[in-house]
Regions:
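A general, composition-driven signal for non-globular sequence regions
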Residues: 1-2, 16
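Bacterial N-terminal signal peptides that target proteins for export
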Residues: 2-11
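Serine-dependent protease modules
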Residues: 24-265
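Bacterial N-terminal signal peptides
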Residues: 12-22
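General helical structural elements
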Residues: 11-12, 79
């Protein structure tokens, strides 16, 4: 074999090795910066306040045994005490008129809802409708200002291993972007009657509830709802698939509630 043939063989062998690597590298995003910059104005931070009523022990210094029926009986004789509590969450704008989607547990029993848009603009919001069973709520910002909405993607087309990004308000820090992949589909974790979660390893923490899970097209394919454990550091988060969420959201906007069919005698 002459030298030209040897060089040609080596070149062909190297080319065969490189081509699959180059093809695979196209699947890995070099940066999420452009996508995050486009989507962040549509993701909101939500803070709520509510009044909680507790009653003091009518017999200071005395503790009923665990499970004692007298504890509930005498609790009514205690002095009622009110205190203000607050909660944080996330959401995303789906209509230029200021319609926001979030989790029901973020706004449940809230007396005041404040939504922060694009980092510094704050608006009061009212609940259009909420559904505890699916843990979805829809809000209306009380303003005539126009906003940049995001759109829903087809969660049925999302595949295990696909890249995703989550944007939210972890620990009240404001717009925070994390990335990961879809780790599993059709997960049930015992939170509610209707469960079909997308599992992701994108970091989700307290305050991310109600925020969007985006695919690489910038479409919402999930609503971040739960984490496994007390914090999000273990890399297991769960999102309501967009196709399921859209059915509930459309009904909440139209009727203020969900209308489910029931079978019975």
């Amino acid at each position: 074999m002459d030298m030209y043939a040897v060089k040609k063989t080596i070149f062909t062998f190297i080319l065969i090795l490189i081509l699959p690597l180059k093809s695979f590298s196209k699947e890995i995003p070099g940066s999420f910066a452009d996508l995050a910059e486009r989507l962040m104005p549509s993701v909101v931070n939500i803070s709520t306040t509510q009044t909680v009523v507790t009653r003091s022990n009518p017999f200071p210094g005395f503790q009923f045994p665990p499970g004692s029926p007298f504890e509930d009986m005498f609790k009514e004789f205690g002095t009622p005490q009110e205190r203000q509590t607050s909660a944080l969450g996330s959401g995303f704008i789906i209509d230029a008129k200021g319609i926001v989607v979030t989790n029901n547990h973020v706004i449940q029993d809230a007396e005041d809802i404040i939504v922060r848009v694009d980092g510094d603009k704050e608006f009061k919001a009212k609940v259009i409708g909420s559904d505890p069973l699916s843990d979805i709520a829809v809000l209306q910002l009380e303003t005539k200002e126009k906003f940049t909405p995001v759109k829903f993607g087809d969660s049925d087309k999302a595949r295990i291993g696909d890249w995703v990004i989550a944007i939210g308000n972890p620990f009240g820090l404001g717009g925070t972007v994390t990335s990961g992949i879809i780790s599993a589909r059709n997960r049930s974790i015992g939170l509610s009657r209707y469960e079909d979660y997308i599992q992701t390893d994108a970091s989700i923490n307290s305050g991310n509830s109600g925020g969007p899970l985006f695919d690489m097209n910038g479409d919402v394919i999930g609503i971040n709802t739960a984490i496994l454990g007390r914090n999000g550091s273990i890399g297991i988060g769960f999102s309501i698939p967009s196709n399921s969420a859209k059915i509930v959201i459309d009904q909440l906007i139209k009727f203020g509630e969900t209308k489910r069919g029931w079978l019975g005698v």
